[in-house]
Amino acid sequence: MKCPFCNASDTKVVDTRASEDDKIVRRRRECISCHKRFTTYERYDFNNLTVVKKDKNREAFDRDKVYRGMKKSCEKRPVPDSVLLEATKEIEVELTHSNKREVDSSEIGELIMKKLKKIDKVAYIRFASVYREFTDVKSFNEEISKLDNE
């Protein structure tokens, strides 16, 4: 681990703590050269999870892409970032617990819609309109009717 202050490659771990859910490890480090301290966070690596797109192309799972999709749907809505970050984490955990090496993008889209439906119905409709490729007002009305009937 390189020191962010002096770029020396020799550091030592001073303190290690796990998060409440044991998904992230926080480490306090000290540089041997300049003696400054800094914090690092280690998280489970999702690079072993591959997303299969509609066109059958494959790419590594990207949690930021999930977050950005939800964030875009919630623009100008009263939804705190902390809620979206928690939902992103829950989607990650659900995908991890499925023990699949590959997951269809449609499965991720459905998980996002499920979370957004609970968080904010307007954001849900926004996401659904893009994800399900609504082409007319009728599609919007049908989805809104489904929400009203729940």
Swiss-Prot record:
Belongs to the NrdR family. It comes from Finegoldia magna (strain ATCC 29328 / DSM 20472 / WAL 2508). This is Transcriptional repressor NrdR. HAMAP family: NrdR. The lineage of its organism: Bacteria, Bacillati, Bacillota, Tissierellia, Tissierellales. The keyword Zinc-finger applies. Negatively regulates transcription of bacterial ribonucleotide reductase nrd genes and operons by binding to NrdR-boxes. Disulfide bonds: none annotated. Its cofactor is Zn(2+). One of its GO terms (molecular function) is zinc ion binding. Residues 49-139 form the ATP-cone domain. Keywords: ATP-binding, DNA-binding, Metal-binding, Nucleotide-binding, Repressor, Transcription, Transcription regulation, Zinc, Zinc-finger. Binds 1 zinc ion. A zinc finger (unnamed) spans 3-34. GO terms for biological process: negative regulation of DNA-templated transcription. NCBIfam families: transcriptional regulator NrdR.
